[in-house]
Amino acid sequence: MSSKRAKAKTTKKRPQSATSNVFAMFDQSQIQEFKEAFNMIDQNRDGFIDKEDLHDMLASLGKNPTDEXLEGMMNEAPGPINFTMFLTMFGEKLNGTDPEDVIRNAFACFDEEASGFIHEDHLRELLTTMGDRFTDEEVDEMYRERIDKKGNFNYVEFTRILKHGAKDKDD
């Protein structure tokens, strides 16, 4: 009897596998945005994101990532990264228990020194020229009271505020 139950259970779970269910996690416009992001990263247009694609994409943004950093990014995937895997990885991250990490890691892609800061001019350029482009006014609003004296944006603190709210500060 227990083998029948196990068999029935396995059959029930099959339709809910990550590849078939991942497209149901997002609406059509979100999937389109992910596709645009995937295509931006897939520099050689072979339908897969590999280490060279990541390197070329980051180099196009003025970054020179180390081999170790690239390996770390690639090791987050259990196998080759085609669009379905890319979407699955984002789906798992976005529906995970700590979306704060997802946001922080998105900023960290542009923080070569892993300092927790991105210079305001560089971040403004990225935000106004890539993906869902921000207007200068939207960037100004995001920067309000968040740029230090050296002109750096503290994305670690910004992410914390996004997820947990601002702490009261006595200036």
Curated annotation (Swiss-Prot):
Q: In which tissues is it expressed?
A: Smooth muscle tissues and in some, but not all, nonmuscle cells.
Query: Is Hydrolase tagged as a keyword?
Result: no
Instruction: List, in alphabetical order, the GO biological process terms annotated in this UniProt record.
Output: myofibril assembly; stress fiber assembly
Residues covered by the EF-hand domain: 29-64, 98-133
Query: Which is a Pfam family this sequence falls into?
Result: EF-hand_7
Q: Compositional bias of type Basic residues: which residue ranges?
A: 1-15
**Gene Ontology terms for molecular function:** calcium ion binding; myosin heavy chain binding; structural constituent of cytoskeleton
N-acetylserine is found on S2
SMART domains per record: EFh
Cellular component GO terms, alphabetically?
cell cortex; cytoplasm; myofibril; myosin II complex; stress fiber; Z disc
| Family matches, as InterPro entries | EF-hand-dom_pair, EF_Hand_1_Ca_BS, EF_hand_dom, Myosin_RLC
Q: Which keywords are on file for this protein?
A: Acetylation, Calcium, Cytoplasm, Cytoskeleton, Metal-binding, Motor protein, Muscle protein, Myosin, Phosphoprotein, Repeat
Q: Which CDD domains match?
A: EFh (cd00051)
Give me the ranges of the annotated region Disordered.
Answer: 1-21
Post-translationally, this protein is described as follows, namely: Phosphorylation increases the actin-activated myosin ATPase activity and thereby regulates the contractile activity. It is required to generate the driving force in the migration of the cells but not necessary for localization of myosin-2 at the leading edge. Phosphorylation is required for myotube formation. Phosphorylated by DAPK3; DAPK3-mediated phosphorylation is inhibited by LUZP1.
Known function: Myosin regulatory subunit that plays an important role in regulation of both smooth muscle and nonmuscle cell contractile activity via its phosphorylation. Implicated in cytokinesis, receptor capping, and cell locomotion. In myoblasts, may regulate PIEZO1-dependent cortical actomyosin assembly involved in myotube formation.
> What else is noted?
This chain binds calcium.
Question: Which PANTHER family does UniProt cross-reference here?
Answer: MYOSIN REGULATORY LIGHT CHAIN 2
The entry describes its oligomerization and partners as: Myosin is a hexamer of 2 heavy chains and 4 light chains: interacts with myosin heavy chain MYO19. Interacts with LUZP1; the interaction results in inhibition of phosphorylation of MYL9 by DAPK3.
Q: What is this protein called?
A: Myosin regulatory light polypeptide 9
Source organism per UniProt: Rattus norvegicus
Taxonomic lineage is:
Eukaryota, Metazoa, Chordata, Craniata, Vertebrata
Q: Name the encoding gene, please.
A: Myl9
